[in-house]
């Protein structure tokens, strides 16, 4: 990927966060999790801590509920978001 990598740094800047909205989010094995709806920003550090994912696959997330994915799970971002890790599935509703 030629876009943003996560490394030890967190994405910063309003322009970057705006461009995340609507990107497809993929699991490490290539399955589509859903779409980025928004980013959660820590107000003290102004850094992204989570991506809020909508339209999740019901086979991966019970009830297709929206999901907050920790930034540390993100491997890289370009035209899509690729996760480095995702818990065993499906994610239960409770």
Where do the PLM segments sit?
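Peripheral interaction segments used for macromolecular assembly
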Residues: 1-94
């Amino acid at each position: 990927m030629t876009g943003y990598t996560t490394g030890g740094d967190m994405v910063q800047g309003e322009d970057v966060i705006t461009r995340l909205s609507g990107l497809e989010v993929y699991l490490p094995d290539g399955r589509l999790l859903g779409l980025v709806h928004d980013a959660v920003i820590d107000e003290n550090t102004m850094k992204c801590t989570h991506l809020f994912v909508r339209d999740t696959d019901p086979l991966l997330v019970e009830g297709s509920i929206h999901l907050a994915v920790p930034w540390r799970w993100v491997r890289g971002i370009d035209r899509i978001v690729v996760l480095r890790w995702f818990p065993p599935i499906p994610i239960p509703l409770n």
